[in-house]
């Protein structure tokens, strides 16, 4: 799982059957200081109703259909992050 920030929305008029009815988000992975990382941006399926600038938890999974592919899914909206200094 990765900690990421929602940085945009993706509009797709044609989607595979598994993605129909799903919202797609642009997410950027955050580093340990919760700053966006360069070259770490993905499109993810929104499973929780996340919005722009939300901090989210995302996971990568293998979709098991006729064409196996990897996909990213937003699975939680993060309220707070606590860590030892």
Segments predicted by a language model, with ranges:
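Structural detector for short beta-strands of small beta-barrel domains
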Residues: 1-13
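C-terminal structural segments of small proteins and small subunits
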Residues: 55-85
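Short aromatic-glycine-enriched beta-strand elements
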Residues: 18-27
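Short, structured beta-strand/loop micro-motifs enriched in basic residues and often containing a Trp
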Residues: 33-41
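A generic structural motif
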Residues: 10, 14, 31, 78-81
């Amino acid at each position: 799982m990765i900690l990421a920030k929602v940085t945009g929305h993706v509009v797709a008029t044609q989607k595979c059957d598994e993605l129909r009815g799903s919202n797609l988000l642009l997410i950027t992975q955050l580093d340990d200081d919760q700053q966006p990382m360069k070259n770490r941006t993905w499109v993810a399926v929104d499973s929780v109703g996340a919005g722009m600038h939300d901090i989210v938890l995302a996971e990568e999974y293998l979709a098991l259909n006729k064409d196996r592919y990897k996909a990213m899914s937003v699975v939680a909206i993060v309220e707070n992050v606590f860590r030892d200094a």
